[in-house]
Amino acid sequence: MAMAARKQRILEAIVALYANGGEPVGSGLLANYFDMALSSATLRNEMAALTKLGLLEQPHTSAGRVPSAQGYRYYLDHLIDAPKASALPDADRRHIDDLFAAMDAEPEKLVPAAARSLADLTGCAAAATTPQAPDLCIAHFEVVQVGRYSAAVLAVTSAGGVRTRVARVDTGLSRDDAANIAQLLNRGLTFVAPQDLSPMLMASLVLAAGERLSPVIMAAQALVTTGPQACLEGAQYLAKMPDVRQNLGTLLEIFSDNEAATELIRPEGSRVTATLGCDLDPAMPGCCIVSKRYLAGGGLTGSVALIGSTRMEYERLLPILDYFAAKLGQSMAGQGQ
């Protein structure tokens, strides 16, 4: 949709004023915003035209307007500059640096800690996933006896990460059992993509190991198919947002399903992706999810996202998200703080 520059400036101003005040924006407030460079009559005409285009809505009989979902989509696609971490004030940058310096670098602890800090910093909910690579697989298995009836299955990924799972064997497990089944796993499950784990392959491994050791085989299968883990922090901030809190139950339900949560916050490409709640399935009107990919080294990538109202302060929050994603990737890659 081609739109005159003046209409674009007015839409941009209404998005900013509505984000700050939470009330419909009238021509008088707009005139003050533009330092009286445009008359109230001119602004009323332009607002009426933007309403006809479907970019503004009039929520009640007052003269004020608010951005529609279509208006926010146009703003996000055409009017807001690509966020740059360099746009952050030095004080905000140093504060984020200090936050990461205090975090545990272990991925399973770093991801929720980063999401929690991002939520507290922005006043939105924040979500993140542990890093993953499209072609990640298991390169080596070890099976360690940790008790008479328990074995720890350790898997080293092709990116050098370690996954573990404990299996219980009701009939007991010897050291020889652990060594033999480790050999079996290394012959049958290393460098196998999750989608290639056929029922026939798993049945053959259980047959070779014996039924009593099948829990160890199942633990190894779970390690092969483990995907990125998603977490949600700061949900309490959504409960304070009148236009978002009705969606809180839906959001929590999505995050109870790790695969659905990971897909929800997955950005498109390397740029910041903003998804309006009305475009989601199920729809979450009044909500917006802004996500960014982070690079964790070795081909590993993850996602970090802000979840809040469609009237969030995009110009302030997107550079914060951009810098947070960069810092999270650096910390994951072990590049220091």
Whereabouts are the PLM-identified features?
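Short alpha-helical segments that sit at the start of domains
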Residues: 1-12
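Hydrophobic residues on short alpha-helical segments
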Residues: 11-15, 72
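Short helix-capping/hinge SLiMs at alpha-helix to coil transitions
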Residues: 16-23
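Conserved, well-folded catalytic cores of nucleic-acid-processing
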Residues: 17, 33, 53, 74-82, ...
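Short, flexible active-site-proximal loops enriched in glycine and acidic residues
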Residues: 21, 58-62, 82-91
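N-terminal helix-turn-helix
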Residues: 24-79
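Intrinsically disordered, acidic Ser/Thr/Pro-rich low-complexity regulatory segments
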Residues: 83-337
